[in-house]
């Protein structure tokens, strides 16, 4: 069954959606959030009504065998599954950078982790979770929580997140600069919120053998890549004016970071638009920092 949460959509859009064989839930939240919409939908479903809940964004498109692959993976014993999201349309620098960020996360935090025997991270769309577990736990979450909170709950219970690298979710929607700044500011905020709410559990996670959970907490310690790149660039150039050994260290760290990002970026993204998007990074990073400072003042 397909359930669509319509929050502040236009009446004509709702009329079009109502013609499809779906369950349409219309809502007009004062403060909209993805978690609030998901909680609203799940609350109207009965216990044991389904086996799996699959979370998708409105712009997502999947292959014809997508549900079959997810169902077979669930039947094999995986209670939490993350599929491979791909940005299908990349007309702007922002959409290209979003695609690169997503694929780096797919390479390191999902495929890389699974290859090492560690749990994959969730990305908020194309995510399948056992229905009974999800319905029981979703009601305890706040309206502004995101997939990181769901992830921490799964890992606390030793529920492994499987990653299906060859099962794709295609994202079609393109975001502008304003949404880019807001989105990345929110990601940074939720990362450190997740860190501060889980850091006290780190010693217990290590001692009790919950290594997936401990690994995720340690990940949240690391600066977001945009900020980390800025720090490495700043100290690399400043170190030139100090001792040569400090210069070697910082330039070595910078080159290692850039090499890691290059290896994690798939070949299909390295096209004629790639270099142009790379040149836009300093301006987008500066805009993001300015946007964060402006929001704090407000």
Predicted segment positions?
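Hydrophobic targeting segments
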Residues: 1-6, 24
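A conserved acidic beta->alpha catalytic loop
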Residues: 6-13, 28-31, 61
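Acidic donor-binding/catalytic loop of UDP-sugar-dependent glycosyltransferases
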Residues: 12, 57-72
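Long helical/loop segments within the catalytic core of UDP-sugar-dependent glycosyltransferases
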Residues: 26-37, 47, 69-143, 185, ...
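Short aromatic/hydrophobic "clamp" motif used to bind/position activated sugar donors
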Residues: 53
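Basic/Trp-rich segment in TM-proximal cytosolic loops or flexible interdomain/linker regions
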Residues: 116-117, 175-261, 265-282
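Acidic donor-binding loop at a coil-to-helix junction in glycosyltransferase catalytic cores
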Residues: 144-150
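Catalytic donor-sugar/metal-binding loop of nucleotide-sugar-dependent glycosyltransferases
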Residues: 151-170
């Amino acid at each position: 069954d397909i359930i669509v949460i319509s929050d502040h959509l236009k009446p004509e859009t709702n009329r079009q959606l109502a013609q499809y064989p779906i369950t349409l839930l219309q809502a007009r939240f004062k403060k909209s959030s993805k978690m609030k919409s998901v909680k609203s939908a799940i609350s109207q479903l009965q216990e044991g009504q389904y086996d799996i809940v699959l979370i998708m964004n409105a712009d997502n498109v999947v292959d014809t065998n997508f549900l079959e692959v997810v169902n077979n993976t669930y039947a094999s014993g995986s209670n939490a599954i993350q599929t491979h999201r791909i940005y299908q349309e990349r007309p702007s620098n922002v959409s290209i950078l979003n695609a690169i960020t997503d694929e780096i996360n797919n390479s390191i935090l999902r495929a890389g982790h699974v290859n090492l025997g560690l749990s994959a991270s969730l990305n908020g769309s194309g995510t399948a979770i056992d229905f009974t577990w999800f319905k029981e736990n979703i009601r305890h979450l706040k309206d502004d929580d995101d997939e990181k909170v769901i992830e921490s709950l799964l890992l606390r219970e030793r529920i492994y997140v499987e990653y299906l690298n060859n099962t794709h979710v295609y994202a079609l929607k393109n975001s502008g600069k304003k949404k880019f700044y807001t989105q990345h500011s929110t990601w940074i905020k939720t990362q450190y919120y997740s860190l501060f709410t889980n850091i006290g559990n780190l010693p217990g996670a290590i001692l009790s053998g919950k290594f997936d959970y401990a690994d995720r907490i340690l990940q949240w310690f690391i600066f977001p890549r945009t900020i980390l790149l800025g720090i490495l660039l700043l100290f690399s150039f400043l170190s030139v004016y100090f001792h040569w050994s400090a210069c070697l260290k910082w330039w070595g760290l910078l080159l290692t970071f850039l090499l890691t990002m290059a290896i994690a970026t798939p070949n299909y993204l390295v096209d004629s638009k790639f270099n142009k998007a790379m040149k836009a990074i300093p301006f987008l990073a500066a805009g993001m920092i300015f946007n964060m400072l402006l929001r704090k003042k407000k």
